[in-house]
Amino acid sequence: MAALLDGKTAVVTGAASGNGRAIARRFATAGADVVIADLQAEDRMGGDPTHEVIEGETDARAAFVECDVTDRDDLGAAVSRAEEFGGLDAMVNNAGIVGPQKPLTEVGYEGYRQLMDANLDGVYFGTQIAAAAMIDRGEGGSIINMSSVAGLEGTAGITPYSAAKGGVRLFTYAAAADLGPEGIRVNAIHPGAIETAMTTEDSPVFGTEQEEQMSAVTPLRRLGQPEDVANVVLFLASELSDFVTAESIAIDGGLVNTA
């Protein structure tokens, strides 16, 4: 049986570390060639660059492209690199930032704008540029947008992040309606607490009392790993989800719907 993504090519933004890294590696083990689009090639958790890991552990081709998702030219360059591999089949708009936790009244315009640019605008234009390439090719495709459980429910202290991630969810539905006739599926995922640099360094959950508290009230009694996210994204990128579009999938062990 052929691997799920044999002969496919994908772009994953923010793939040097965390969820994006796990997604890129999972795609490669499923047969896809992968473009790693990130600000830097180095893994924030100290591992070897993702493209080097992929080339060392699979037969897939991998390339790193320096990419700031707030720059449309950078996004275009990442998609162009995928076209050199044979054509873009899957786009994962994963890159994002959480920013400092502050009350709503203390959030400055620059801080707000930075979060919206990275978390919402980057997804919007990443989707737009990927869709244009897929339409030109005429073979459809799959676009997966990274939201968050913070885009499903209000969360104190991270209002710009919640606003951006909620925007990703509704934008995904609208994009799916626009692009469905072209054979392009668009879905959003909503990770909960997943062990990455974002949740161990930027906005610490893992290694704190909060980890124990959240695990205790999560139906599956644990928090997540990047591989949990990667497996869902693989499904959405593959033909197994051929009739799935305009969907949001929470990857949080059941917490958001049972808390």
Pin down the residues of each PLM region:
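Active-site helix of classical SDR
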Residues: 127, 164, 172
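Short-chain dehydrogenase/reductase
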Residues: 2-86, 99-100, 110-111, 201
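Alpha-helical segment proximal to the catalytic Tyr-Lys
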Residues: 132, 136, 177-181, 242
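Residue(s) in the substrate-gating loop at a strand-loop-helix junction
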Residues: 148
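Short C-terminal tail/terminal secondary-structure segment
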Residues: 98-101, 153, 216-220, 234, ...
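Short, small/polar-rich loop/turn modules that mediate ligand/substrate recognition or access, typified
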Residues: 87, 180, 185, 244-246
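Substrate-binding pocket helix/loop in short-chain dehydrogenase/reductase
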Residues: 102-104, 111-116, 214
